[in-house]
Every structure is written in C-alpha cells, then in structure tokens.
Amino acid sequence: MLRPKKQSLKPKLKHRPFLKWAGGKFRLTDEINKAFPNKKNCLIEPFVGAGAVFLNSNFERYILADINPDLINLFNIVKXNVDGYIEDCKPIFFADDANTPDYYYAKRRQFNASTEPFERSIIFLYLNRFGFNGLCRYNSKNEFNVPFGAYKTHYFPEDELRYFAHKAQSAVFLCCDFQKTFEFADKDSVIYCDPPYAPLQQETNFTGYAGNEFGLAQQRALADLAKSIQKEKQISILISNHDTKFTREIYNGAKFKRVKVQRSISQNPEKRVKVKELIAIFGARK
C-alpha cells in the first residue's frame, strides 16, 4: 500500500482546479463529499482528471491516478517545484501573441515533437487554458489535436497552482488504469470513480479516454470490478456517471443519488442544458 505523507487539510472555500476539464466535478464536490463514508483516511481516484474532488475533500492521504501520462507528469512537477514551474510558465502565457492561432498551433507542434517532461508540462497547461473549452484529446498518432479556443481573455491560474502544490504533498500521483489503481485499496480507503461519461443515447458508443476508447464494455468492466472489490474489501466505492437506463443496469445493487448538472462543454451554446447524473454508491456509509 502506498503511503504518501500525511497531511490534514480543511478547505474553508471551494478550490478550483488549475486545469479546465471536460466533465470536471467542481460543481458536485459538496454532493460527493456528503456521500463519502466517515472515518476513512485515504481517498483513491482512478480517474483523477483535473482533481476537483481531491482539492475539495478532507482525507489524510490520496492515491490519484489517470492513464494520461501528460496529466500525471504535470501534477508531479507542480507538486515537486511549483515556484520554478510558475516562473517558467509565465513567458509563454504572457507573450504578446499568446492568444493567437499562429502562436497556439506553433506551441501545439512543439508539444507534439517534445520528449522532455518539463517542457511538455508547461506547454500542456498553455494548451489547456488557450485551447477549445479545456478539452484534452489526442489523435491515433498520440498527438494532441485540440483546436485553438479563440477566447477574448485568459487567466493564469497561479493561486490555483500553489494550492494544488500545497495539497499535493499528501498525495501520490500514478499513471495507470483503473484496474491497477483498485489494487491499492485497503480497509482505510474509499474509492471515487469519475470515468468518461456513458453515452446519453445508446447509439453514441464512444467516449474519449486520453486517446483511447472507453466504451460500454469498459463501463461495464468498471462496474463489475467495483462490485467485486467492495465485497472483497468491505469498503465504499462511488461512481459518477450519466443517469441512464444503461448505467442503472450496470450499477445494479448500488444506492443511487441523483443530481442535475449544467453541461459546460458544447460547440453549440444552445445545447448547454442541465443533464441528469447519478452517483452510484457501493457499500454502506460507515
């Protein structure tokens, strides 16, 4: 069992992630916290994303994973040296032509050509903040291919980076899949899963997962593993997803908590409507 440094943090205000993120759970952190069991000291997240739940929860230890190596590389760099990271980010963010298509696509080409972890981490943040709606998407060649966002104004998230680095001292960041992440669970853990959304309509059978498909078979595999590990370890496991006939079927046996969320990522602003989601809770709240 990994043992990151213990640290008790009690956030008084909600803390935004320093990354924009499709499907992020910032608006749902209060509801998710209410569903967590008491007297558990380690939160495990197999799909950490931008880390909204991590930043707004109060566990002594965190094991946070994602299959996106760029994301985990960034988190580990910010954790280890946030001052140096911020200093080296600013020349890119505050360049006179930073908010232009030519600059953006030049940086995207530089990112895709780079194999240097620190350089990639800096450009990854720039692409995230200046790209279209905070999407993180790769093509079949594993090249980042999100288009320019064309926003009027931009914000450099220095305060958010510093809070993340502070809280990250109690966390371990791992690049691995959900099956491997589940292996770290013990009796003192709770697992929260925020997988790519299952489709609202069955015929839409694909969700991007760091360049890989996370389709209905993977959704079912996650649900089956959650049931198995919950029974074996006698711990609570929570999964967020769309509230559909399919998700209710695969999460059969869980307690359901329904919520409505404003969908924030869409190319058509008229389609930004409230969507029904659920939190499936496996295991009694203790």
Swiss-Prot record:
<dbReference type="GO" id="GO:0009007">
    <property type="term" value="F:site-specific DNA-methyltransferase (adenine-specific) activity"/>
</dbReference>
<dbReference type="GO" id="GO:0032259">
    <property type="term" value="P:methylation"/>
</dbReference>
<dbReference type="Pfam" id="PF02086">
    <property type="entry name" value="MethyltransfD12"/>
</dbReference>
<dbReference type="GO" id="GO:1904047">
    <property type="term" value="F:S-adenosyl-L-methionine binding"/>
</dbReference>
<feature type="binding site">
    <location>
        <position position="66"/>
    </location>
    <ligand>
        <name>S-adenosyl-L-methionine</name>
    </ligand>
</feature>
<dbReference type="GO" id="GO:0009307">
    <property type="term" value="P:DNA restriction-modification system"/>
</dbReference>
<dbReference type="GO" id="GO:0006298">
    <property type="term" value="P:mismatch repair"/>
</dbReference>
<dbReference type="InterPro" id="IPR029063">
    <property type="entry name" value="SAM-dependent_MTases_sf"/>
</dbReference>
<keyword id="KW-0808">Transferase</keyword>
<feature type="binding site">
    <location>
        <position position="25"/>
    </location>
    <ligand>
        <name>S-adenosyl-L-methionine</name>
    </ligand>
</feature>
<dbReference type="InterPro" id="IPR012327">
    <property type="entry name" value="MeTrfase_D12"/>
</dbReference>
<protein>
    <recommendedName>
        <fullName>DNA adenine methylase</fullName>
        <ecNumber>2.1.1.72</ecNumber>
    </recommendedName>
</protein>
<feature type="binding site">
    <location>
        <position position="21"/>
    </location>
    <ligand>
        <name>S-adenosyl-L-methionine</name>
    </ligand>
</feature>
<comment type="similarity">
    <text>Belongs to the N(4)/N(6)-methyltransferase family.</text>
</comment>
<dbReference type="GO" id="GO:0043565">
    <property type="term" value="F:sequence-specific DNA binding"/>
</dbReference>
<dbReference type="InterPro" id="IPR012263">
    <property type="entry name" value="M_m6A_EcoRV"/>
</dbReference>
<keyword id="KW-0949">S-adenosyl-L-methionine</keyword>
<comment type="function">
    <text>May be involved in methyl-directed DNA mismatch repair, initiation of chromosome replication and gene expression.</text>
</comment>
<feature type="binding site">
    <location>
        <position position="194"/>
    </location>
    <ligand>
        <name>S-adenosyl-L-methionine</name>
    </ligand>
</feature>
<keyword id="KW-0235">DNA replication</keyword>
<dbReference type="GO" id="GO:0006260">
    <property type="term" value="P:DNA replication"/>
</dbReference>
<keyword id="KW-0238">DNA-binding</keyword>
<dbReference type="InterPro" id="IPR002052">
    <property type="entry name" value="DNA_methylase_N6_adenine_CS"/>
</dbReference>
<dbReference type="InterPro" id="IPR023095">
    <property type="entry name" value="Ade_MeTrfase_dom_2"/>
</dbReference>
<keyword id="KW-0489">Methyltransferase</keyword>
